Structure formats: C-alpha cells, structure tokens
C-alpha cells in the first residue's frame, strides 16, 4: 500500500507541475494546488520538535516544553517548522489558538503511526500556514462543541493529506479567509446525536472564504454540510472601505468524492448577502461564485434510508440574494445498490443530469440536479445565477482537473493522513467509499443510517491508542498510532529537522544547525527538500531512523480494556441487515454485513 500511495503521489506531482499558467513563485510544496498553493509556512525559519504527547502546563500556566501547545505558541513571529519525535494521540484540554504566523506542521515526520489531535481544537487565525499528514479527531469527551479544526481570519493556508472526523460541530470549519486550499483530505463521520446544544448534527464542513479551493477530498458518512458553502456574509461593508469578512468569494470545488449523505441538499449554501455590499450608485460590490467541477457522488446506506425523491449536486441558499454557480462534469454513480428506488435515481434520469449538470433548470424539470432554495426553476433565474464557461475560464485556474471517475479512483486510495502509515479509521472510510466494504458502524439514535454515528465509541478498532485527558484519567477508543516492533527514531544532532544520516548522504553538515534553513538549487530549503521527499515518497525516512523509540502512551486501564474486549467479542461474527439491525437467519439472496464485509446469503 505504501508503494502504491507513493507512486500516486509522484503522479499527482507531475499533474501539479503541468500547470496551464507558468508560475515564477515557489509552491508551498511541489504537489500544492489551488488558491493556497503559494503559502510559505515556516520556510527558512527555526525548528520546534514535539517530544511529548500530553498537554501539560508549567506551574506558571505556560505550556510545558516539548508539547504541541508549546511548539505552536512560544517564541516570536520568526517562521517555524513543527516536527514530531513522538507518535500517538495528543489530547488537547483546551482550544489551542495560534499566536504566530508562518508555520509548517509536518506530520509526516512522526515515527510509528503518526499523530492524531483529539479533544479541543486548533484555531488557525494567523496567516501563512502549511499542515500535512495530521489527523484531527475531536470526539465527544470535551463538553464544548469543537470543530475538529477551525480556520478563520487567516490567509495563505494549505492543508494537505489530513483527516477530520468525529466532531460535535462541523469536522472542518473554514471561512473569513483568503487564498486557502484543502486537498487530499478525509472529512466526515461527524457525530449525530451527541452533546451539541442544538441537537442532532452529523455535519462534515462549513467551508468557503475568499479564493478557496477544495480538491481530491473524501467527504463521507455525514447527513449534511458536505459541504455547506459559507457564502458572503452580512457584516462586510465594502462601500465604507471595510473588508473584515468574506465579501468577494470565488470558491473552486473539484475532483472530490461525496459518499453516504442523508439530505437532498446536503451540499448547499453559497449565499450572497449583498445588503451592505453596494457602492453609492447602488451597484453591487460583493459577490459569491462557486465553481463545482467533476465531483463524484456515491450514495450510501444513509442515502438509501432517507429514500430521497429529490437529489441535488447542490442547492443554493439565499440571504439577501443567491450566489452564482458553475457546474461541470459532476456525476451521481449510476446502478448503485444504495440509490433510492425513486424516479430521480433511475439510470436514465441520472444519465441526463450527469451529461448536463444544469439539465432542466431553465424548464423546471422536476428531477434537476441543481436547485435554488425558494427560487423558481426557470430561464430567468438560470440566466441570473448560472455562470458560463467563459466566466469559469476567466478565473485562470492553474490546476489540472481530472474526470469524476478518475478522481474517484485516486481519492479512494490516497486521501487522508497516509503517512507515516494509514490508520484503521482512514483505511475503513476509504474502503467504504470505494465500495470494497459497506458501512457497518452506526449510532443508537438512527440505526437505519449505517455509517452515521453518535460517538466515536460506536466504532470498534482491532487495536487502540490510550492517552491522558487530565492529570490522572486515561481514555482510549482512538485508532492505534503507537510504534510497532521495529519502528525507530531518527537522530538529528544539530536540531535542524534533518536526520544526521540524511545530511551526510546529501553532503550537508550534521553538526550545523543552520544549513537546513538554507535554500537549495531547487529554491526550497534543504529541510523542505527532505520534508517534501518524505511526503511524496521519493525519500524513505525509515532508512534514517536508527535510534530506539520508547512509547509515551499510558497503559490501558484494566476496566476499560475489559469493556472494549467484551464489545468487540459481541460484535464479531454477528450479521446485520442493511439497516444495521442484528440478523439471525438471512433470506436467500439477501445482502447482509458480517465483520465489516458485505455478503449475500446463498
């Protein structure tokens, strides 16, 4: 699997370099795409190593050295690169708000299985940030409704190969931003009937910002907001020279896979609240334009259970006015066993809207795949709210865009935090979306909605991480990321972020703490060349990991381990129908689930 992923990443690198527009600026990394592709992060700055998994504080309330909180908040605005000498789950006891700009967080450098951030969230509110290969799994242990990651009031952000799951709010929140990219991520399995004060959720992402790109992401196992396009908000007053919130919005959403949603309008939003965005002559200053291209929609058991008589690629919302939309090449998977038995889902109907995403809007066709909430489907509104191909071409996107089918194959093998190795959670979610297994896990609230969970405790793993949530309490229930037998740690004597053996191999000085920040012939710093090589598979970092690694995870409490084992034994070899109900005697030819596998009774 690792060699397959590496090969795919090298292919993606070639796609990224075959841009339609020649760029002189250096990309964040060679595979960077979209509006956030030119973030510089910690380039040329200092290195901070995370050396412990806890979220401890000193007696004066400052973060303990070696913690993630310390690495992200201490010091000044000098660019920094955060690397990891630990592996496992880091439970944040409170929100971690960035205090400085110009940060790279390189999860691919961790030993063992890598890094997961649980509990409270990281709040990105500073510019110029690169995040790669980190899992953000908030969970329901905290009492607050945290999104797994919150990005607001920031610009020049790129998030690559990360995973966002198990949030009581959206799994990823990103708006009031400019020049951002979310690429090759897994977003989903939001918690449904959890502890949120507003009740049931199961939301994937509220996403937008001015000049935002989302591409090659899997959005899965959520009833709604897959995504919710944030749109233009009411607060901006461009006529008075203010620009504090999203007001002139271009969002590009392409080559994503949406699986197992539960609402006809699970993609919606994109409002243009223009009530304050007018010049003195009354002309509109603010706008919202969403470009949706070649995304792949695959129904799942929650879609089937909803029995939807309508289904949309997107439904635009109104707040003052509707935004404008460009749709091209999006497709619903035909002949899927989870497609509801409704006219809107018949193969001939899907063929029409797959061939022309705007089919029937001007004529009011009942089974159209684009809709505006509350607006008539007619020729006038088509002309007003639909962008044409010339307007799409005018924004001059440099990215190479694949067909929906090609994107589906690549996303379902390569999205998420794949390094240092893929965990059990991401492996399952990719397999579900790819159709090699059917969703099995379900919460107690809606047992017919397979794949929709109430708590991370609804998921069973063959092996788990354990971590402290306070000074004395140990919890588990998260996928195993600790080191396996044979996993080691790289020695970095000078602390410049590069292993000693690598520096020697490259003709650098393993005792010079400055050479990592120096630019190479390629333009990237020597440290960036190492990080980029590890990420795209051209560098095997295990060749340089020669030092023994000692686990920092606490032992599992005896009573907790006993409960987990009892639940696992109860689940094993039990058969379930497609509504998640235990099944004693399947009927002939009946499809059922056993140990996460779809089977048919003979």
Language-model features: where?
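Acidic Gly/Asp/Thr-rich repetitive segments characteristic of extracellular carbohydrate-active
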Residues: 27-81, 577-584
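Right-handed parallel beta-helix
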Residues: 102, 106-107, 127-138, 153-166, ...
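Extracellular beta-strand/beta-solenoid scaffold signature
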Residues: 117-122, 142-150, 166-174, 195-209, ...
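Extracellular calcium-associated, cysteine-rich motifs in secreted modular proteins
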Residues: 475-556
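Extracellular beta-rich repeat passengers
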Residues: 228, 252-473
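C-terminal tail/sorting-segment detector
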Residues: 591-602
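Residue-level detector of functionally pivotal "anchor" positions at catalytic/ligand-binding pockets or at interdomain
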Residues: 552-579
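Extracellular beta-strand-rich solenoid/capping regions of secreted or surface-exposed proteins
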Residues: 64-76, 90-104, 114-132, 138-155, ...
């Amino acid at each position: 699997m690792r060699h397959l992923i590496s090969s795919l990443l090298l292919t993606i690198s070639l796609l990224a370099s075959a841009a339609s527009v020649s760029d002189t600026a250096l990309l964040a990394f060679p595979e960077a795409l979209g509006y956030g592709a030119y973030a510089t992060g910690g380039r040329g700055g200092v290195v901070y190593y995370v050396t412990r998994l806890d979220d401890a504080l000193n007696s004066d309330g400052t973060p303990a050295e070696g913690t993630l909180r310390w690495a992200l908040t201490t010091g000044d605005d000098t660019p920094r690169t955060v690397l990891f000498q630990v592996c496992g789950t880091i439970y944040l006891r409170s929100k971690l708000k960035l205090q400085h700009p110009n940060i790279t967080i390189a999860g691919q450098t961790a030993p063992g299985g890598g890094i997961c951030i649980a509990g409270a969230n990281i709040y990105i509110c500073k510019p110029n940030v690169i995040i790669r290969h980190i899992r953000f799994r908030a969970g329901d242990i905290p009492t607050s409704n945290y999104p797994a990651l919150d990005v607001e009031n920031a610009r020049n952000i790129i998030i690559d190969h990360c995973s966002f799951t198990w949030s009581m709010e959206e799994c990823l929140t990103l708006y009031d931003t400019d020049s951002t990219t979310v690429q090759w991520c897994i977003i989903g399995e939001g918690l449904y009937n959890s502890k949120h004060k507003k009740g049931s959720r199961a939301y994937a992402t509220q996403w937008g910002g001015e000049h935002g790109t989302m591409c090659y992401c899997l959005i899965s196992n959520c009833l709604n907001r897959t995504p919710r396009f944030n749109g233009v908000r009411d607060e901006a007053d461009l006529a008075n020279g203010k620009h504090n919130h999203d007001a002139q919005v271009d969002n590009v959403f392409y080559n994503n896979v949406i699986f197992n949603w539960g609402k006809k309008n699970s993609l919606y939003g994109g409002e243009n609240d223009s009530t304050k965005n007018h010049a003195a002559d009354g002309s509109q200053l603010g706008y919202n334009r969403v470009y949706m291209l070649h995304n792949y929609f695959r129904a799942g058991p929650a879609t089937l259970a909803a029995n939807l008589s309508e289904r949309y690629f997107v439904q635009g919302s109104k707040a003052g006015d509707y935004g404008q939309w460009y749709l091209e090449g999006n497709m619903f998977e035909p002949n899927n066993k989870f497609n509801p038995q409704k006219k809107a889902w018949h193969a001939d109907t899907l063929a029409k809207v797959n061939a022309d995403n705007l089919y029937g809007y001007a004529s009011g066709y009942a089974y159209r795949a684009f809709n505006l909430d509350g607006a008539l489907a007619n020729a006038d509104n088509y002309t007003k709210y639909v962008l044409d191909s010339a307007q799409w071409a005018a924004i001059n996107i440099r990215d190479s865009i694949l067909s929906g089918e090609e994107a589906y194959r690549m996303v379902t093998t390569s999205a998420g935090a794949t390094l240092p190795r893929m965990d059990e959670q991401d492996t399952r979610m990719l397999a579900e979306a790819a159709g090699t297994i059917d969703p099995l896990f379900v919460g107690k609230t809606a047992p017919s909605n397979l794949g929709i969970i109430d708590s991370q405790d609804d998921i069973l793993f063959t092996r788990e991480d354990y971590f402290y949530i306070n000074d004395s309490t140990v919890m588990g229930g998260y996928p195993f990321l600790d080191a396996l037998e044979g996993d080691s740690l790289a020695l970095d004597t000078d602390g410049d972020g590069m292993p000693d053996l690598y520096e020697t191999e490259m003709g650098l000085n393993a005792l010079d703490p400055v050479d990592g920040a120096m630019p190479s012939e390629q333009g990237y710093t020597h440290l960036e060349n190492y990080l980029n090589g590890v990420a795209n598979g051209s560098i095997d970092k295990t060749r340089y990991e020669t030092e023994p690694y000692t686990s920092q995870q606490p032992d599992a409490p005896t009573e907790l381990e006993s409960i987990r084992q009892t639940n696992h034994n109860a689940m094993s070899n039990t058969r379930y129908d497609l509504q998640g109900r235990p099944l004693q005697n399947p009927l002939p030819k009946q499809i059922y689930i056993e140990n996460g596998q779809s089977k048919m009774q003979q």
